[in-house]
Regions:
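A short acidic, often aromatic-flanked loop/helix-cap motif at beta-alpha or helix-coil junctions
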Residues: 1-3, 55-61, 168-170, 294-295
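Predominant activation on well-ordered alpha-helical scaffold segments within soluble catalytic domains
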Residues: 39-42, 93-97, 145-153, 275-279
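Flexible, glycine/charged-enriched surface loops at secondary-structure junctions
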Residues: 49-52, 111, 158-164, 288-293
Length: 295
């Protein structure tokens, strides 16, 4: 492409990424560390992070109408096995939507481990619901994860699952406490949150099939991707977050040694070409990891 065309593509990509994202409970400790803080996220990707304090979150939850909560509980019960009381998580979901409307935000991220003790519940239901409503919603308020998820969600228009690598043996086991129901092939269960025991984490039985794993480097300069296949889900392994999936990758050790740490963003399909183009438009380096070809 000519320089003028590259500039046009870059401007278009940044325009689609740009917007205000609320950090409910504040930005995480990791996100405050330079060079991967909110300021770098704004400069490189045009994503503005606005912190929302714990007192404000609590007040917003108190203002949620009980009738709205009851209506949402009935809606959840149509597709979710509610093995855990979820009134408080539903209040947090509805309060988050209201805060976004009031502050004209287009996305939200949650500082989970400052939030949980304050509101006595998790944002897992909120994250799951908001992603399926077309909102950029991300756990744990980390700048690299937020940036990678924004690229997948806003540039490619896809729902996503943010997860930790819990194990690596013949593949990798990804685990986290929520995923959008649109990625589900079977059941969705609300269970006690693994680390805290609070309500509620989700066990989402993810669809089997080809996926792309995505991560941004700590300096937000390099986009790393790996092709994989979800071979099993809803593993129900003890000692792990509730949504679990075994993912076959070409070279698990290369993936682990090459990735920046933290979370991976999973989306369905072979997205390597689209992500390469996105990286070029955003002036990011691009690297494929886990390079053995999967048949």
């Amino acid at each position: 492409l000519k320089a003028a065309d590259l500039l046009k593509e870059a401007t278009k990509a940044r325009g689609r990424l740009a917007g205000r994202v609320l950090a409910i409970g504040g930005a995480s400790i990791d996100a405050r560390l330079e060079p991967a803080g909110p300021e770098v996220l704004a400069r490189r990707l045009g994503i503005e992070v606005e912190e929302v304090g714990l007192d404000e979150v609590g007040e917003a939850m108190e203002k949620v109408d009980s009738l709205e909560v009851e209506e949402e509980l009935r809606s959840l019960a149509r597709f979710m096995k509610l093995k855990e009381p979820v009134e408080a998580p539903v209040r947090l979901y509805l309060a988050s939507k209201r805060l976004m409307e009031e502050r004209r935000a287009t996305g939200v991220t949650f500082n989970c481990f400052s939030l949980l003790p304050a509101v006595k519940c998790t944002p897992c239901i909120a994250v799951s619901k908001l992603i399926d409503e077309g909102v950029l919603a991300v756990c744990e308020a980390e700048a690299p994860t937020l940036g990678a998820a924004a690229i997948v969600h806003r540039l490619l228009g896809l729902p996503f699952f943010v997860a930790n690598v819990a194990k690596a043996q013949g593949g990798i086991v990804l685990a986290h406490c929520t995923a959008p129901a649109s990625l589900c092939s079977g059941s969705v269960e609300a269970l006690p949150h693994f680390e805290s025991g609070m309500p509620a984490a989700l066990d989402v039985e993810l669809k089997l099939g080809q996926v792309t794993l995505v991560a941004l480097s700590k300096r937000l300069e390099e986009l790393m991707v790996s092709l994989g296949k979800v071979k099993a889900s809803s593993l129900k392994e003890e000692g792990l977050c509730r949504t679990q999936a075994f993912v076959e990758v070409g070279d698990p050790m290369d993936l682990l040694s090459s990735s920046p740490g933290g979370h991976l963003v999973l989306a369905y399909g072979d997205l390597r070409l689209s992500l390469r183009k996105a990286a070029e438009a955003l002036s990011l380096d691009f690297r494929e990891v886990g390079e053995k070809v999967l048949r």
